[in-house]
Amino acid sequence: MAKQKKHPTGTIAQNKKARHDYFIEHKFEAGLVLSGWEVKSLRAGKAHLTDSYVLLKDGEAWLFGSHITPLTTASTHVIADPIRSRKLLLNKRELERVEAAVAQKGYTCVALALYWSKHLIKCEIALGKGKKEFDKRDTVRERDSNRELQRAVRNKGKED
């Protein structure tokens, strides 16, 4: 079997939609409770976090809406549920902080990325406030102006 190429940053999957839909205020690193077939699929990069979010139940954090596609070569004696809820591993202080923030009106907890940290798979979660439509337009406008500015600086150096 050919050696798999590693991601340069160790990133497995990102939730770009979350950065567009929320003002990210604080980030946390959480471990994940996974089964064997899920780890194999994540090594192959078969994960999506597009509509994923974090819920707190009974003092524990759970990741909902993430999709890990099972490999075709995975074991057949284990029933693979690609969209099952996965437990997040946070310490007590982090759980209390997330719980207090989510209890406030307007705050939510979303998953931003899945990545490798040494030999472990971690999930970057964040506390954020939802953006309104005009906030999203402002963000796009600001990004476009920054891009134009960078392009002008780059072209100025070529003209000299």
Curated annotation (Swiss-Prot):
GO BP field? trans-translation
Q: Which InterPro entries does the UniProt record give?
A: SmpB, SsrA-bd_prot, SsrA-bd_prot_CS
UniProt-recorded Gene Ontology molecular function terms = RNA binding
- Residue ranges spanning the membrane: these are none
Q: Which CDD domains match?
A: SmpB
The record's subcellular location field reads: Cytoplasm
Where is the region Disordered? 136-160
Return the protein name.
Answer: SsrA-binding protein
Q: What is the lineage of its organism?
A: Bacteria, Pseudomonadati, Pseudomonadota, Gammaproteobacteria, Pseudomonadales
